[in-house]
Regions:
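The alpha/beta-hydrolase serine catalytic core
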Residues: 115-220, 225-248
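N-terminal cap/lid segment of alpha/beta-hydrolase-fold proteins
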Residues: 1-19
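Gly/Ala-rich beta-loop-alpha elbow adjacent to hydrolase catalytic centers
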Residues: 97-105
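The serine-hydrolase catalytic nucleophile loop
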Residues: 31-44, 202
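Catalytic nucleophile-loop/oxyanion-hole region of alpha/beta-hydrolase
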Residues: 63-88
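Conserved alpha/beta-hydrolase
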Residues: 42-66
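Short beta-strand immediately N-terminal to the catalytic nucleophile in serine-hydrolase-like folds
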Residues: 95-97, 122
Length: 248
């Protein structure tokens, strides 16, 4: 059953929680996705069958949570994730971050040291506002963003275009994790498809090279795309989480 958490910022965050043993598992979704996605629901079913505590939620402006998507940013969604973890979980947690959720997982891990027992990134996209958006734009696109404040981009996942605002990009620049030391003192596993055109494997390799971590491994899956939601990919995801839990 969907429940709601009202944060200190007044945002109403939709969530679904499965009670069970710890360390718990928390799923952090991607940009414009929600907690009814394939990976989130698959993980809930896995958690229920294994008696594992599990939390999935919608960032503000996503899914059933309050707010308009166009008015949110990395800082808001990071704050939502922190609020959800602090209010709804106890003890150590394993974070599972998909795409943008991988970036937010890293921000949470940095902020809640001692609460994070492990991290699984699925096509993790740290710093994507800078590296995969702004740096890839033409001079004309940058001029549009600077002048009118927004840019419309076609989306492969929706009939509606992505509206990218200069405010969103500027907010992202305040939360970059690959420009300063990144200490991850727990098991980290990165899962990445070789056919991912949204977040290429080079991002995972850069994260792997940048982070200081005693136990970090990257698994590349040939032919897997950004969704990483085929039955084989989902099985690999749960097997990887189980491995992290054994080492947590």
């Amino acid at each position: 059953m969907t429940q709601f958490l009202t944060t200190a910022a007044g945002r109403r965050i939709a969530y679904h929680q499965t009670p069970g043993a710890g360390p718990g598992v928390v799923f952090l979704g991607g940009y414009r996705s929600d907690m009814t996605g394939t990976k989130a629901v698959h993980l809930q079913n896995w958690a229920e069958s294994h008696g594992r505590g599990f939390l999935r939620f919608d960032y503000s402006g996503h899914g059933q949570s309050s707010g308009r998507f166009e008015e949110g940013g990395i800082g808001d969604w990071f704050a939502d994730a922190l609020a959800a973890l602090e209010a709804l979980t106890e003890g150590p947690q394993v974070l599972v971050g998909s795409s943008m959720g991988g970036w937010i997982s890293l921000l949470v891990a940095r902020a809640l040291q001692g609460r994070v027992a492990g991290l699984v990134g699925i096509a993790a996209a740290p710093d994507f506002t800078a590296d995969l958006m702004w740096d890839s734009y033409s001079d004309q696109q940058k001029a549009l963003l600077t002048g009118q404040g927004w840019l419309a981009e076609p989306s492969e996942y929706s009939d509606q275009p992505n509206i990218i605002t200069k405010t969103f990009l500027d907010d992202g620049s305040k939360h970059l994790v690959l420009r300063a030391p990144l200490n991850l003192p727990f098991p980290v596993r990165l899962l990445q498809g070789t056919a991912d055109v949204d977040v290429p494997p080079s991002v995972a390799l850069r994260l792997m090279d940048h982070a200081t971590c005693p136990d970090l491994r990257l698994t590349l899956v040939k032919g897997a795309d950004h969704r990483f939601s085929t039955p084989d990919c989902l099985d690999l995801m749960t097997a990887t989480i189980e491995e992290v839990l054994r080492h947590a």
